[in-house]
Amino acid sequence: VYKRQGMGLERLASIMQDVDSIFDVDTVKAIRDHVCKIAGCEYGKEYKKDVSIRVITDHIRSVTFMASDGILPSNEGRGYVMRRLLRRAVRHGKLLGINGLFLKDLVKTVVDCNKCEYNELEEKYDYIVKVLTTEEQNFNATIDRGMKILDDLIAQMQKDGKTELDGESCFKLSDTYGFPIDLTREILEEKGMTCDEEGFAECYAKQRETAKNAHAATKYMGADETVFHKIDKDFHTEFIGYDKLEGDSEISFITTDDELIENAKAGDEVYIISSQTPFYAESGGQVGDIGTIVTESGKCRVVDTQKVVAGKFAHKAVVEEGEIAVGQKAHFTVDRKTRYAVMRNHSCAHLLQAALRKVLGEHVHQAGQLVDAHRLRFDFSHFNAMTAEEKLKVEALVNKYILEALDIKMEEMPIAEAQKLGAMALFGEKYGETVRVVTMGDGDETASIEFCGGTHLDNTSRIGLFKISSESSVASGVRRIEAVTGRGVLELVEERAATIQQAAESLKLANPLDIVK
């Protein structure tokens, strides 16, 4: 019925339970009553307080389910929606006079009211509490900083006999310190003061206009237009490098940083564009290929490959010998050693994400990555630093996948089929009807299935070894692992062994193992 009528479960429940509002439905009322208990007030007595009670009741339900689904507070996408809901709930808690951490107490009520229908809430209770409490603590710190500044402003106003806080100060509190304007307004009202609303609106409009003009100026100076826009928009480069590292193609265009040219001689730094290439262009965190381009009259060293406009691949190159020209046939050769080193790190990044999700939980999602020939850097959603034990477990699991010599399969398929297989997609990424899926392992031994357009090895055993070199914070709710594979692990071990040996010699110890005694 609720689906056909579009009335929603809560509205249907309010009819069945013969109550006036969804906030009087049994499961919602229990949360509302808990909010009132924490705030020390009664619902239905004061309009402004009732609004705050309803906001907290609604938002704590939403963010509890969002956290259960693996979403973390952030500054973009769903994470941003979650952050705004969380902070709005905390802010209304302040308006009700709640000063300490209180969201974690309400989570218990939300879970108790919904665990029969959604048993994953109870399973993830501790995790949900950690996520919400961390964000609440961070926002409280923001509020505390803003309160100190606002208290100083109020004291100065009282000293000067003023009753209105100027719009510029209100805007600075909001824009620079993240202190909500409605909380500023509420605190001023308690002191018998007001906020210069018109002045605040003017500052806000001025900032928007400044940002708009800055963008327009940037566009006017040509930063949004490059030499590559001068090339026919229908021209594109076909990538043939998934299964080959060499290929022949015609040089279609040669450019400098700012103009199209017909030829280039030894010593020139140029961009070479062709209709086909085995060179992978930087994308998805995987760096562009390097190598050589050779014609009958010249040789170029490719130092980078980038996707430019409308599907065109630009080979950044230095002409080392002779001369090259538009229209010449050329032989393109990717540097094999570098490509395979990059593929080791990229394939291992997939195994790393799979291991992180097993050790830390399914809330872990890729938030960014960089894979080059020397290392892999993987950013992921997680709310606090990994323990030493967790890092060891992740390392052990990744190396287990490597030693199991799992086959790596790459295939294109309809997106619906990929989703049925449970392939991991990058949050916020837009995909077409057909996607490329990378699968590591088979059947019960499948370690990873991900959407990915990058290049990979054919078997996990070719990664060799995996070792985490560091784990750190990038932003609130985002952690970063830097790691090495293959020969990089040996180099890291040798470097650390040398450091330990030096420490032992400094302490005049014959055996480095005696350092820990």
Explain the meaning of each model-derived region.
Residues K3-K517:
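A glycine- and charged-residue-rich anion-binding loop/surface
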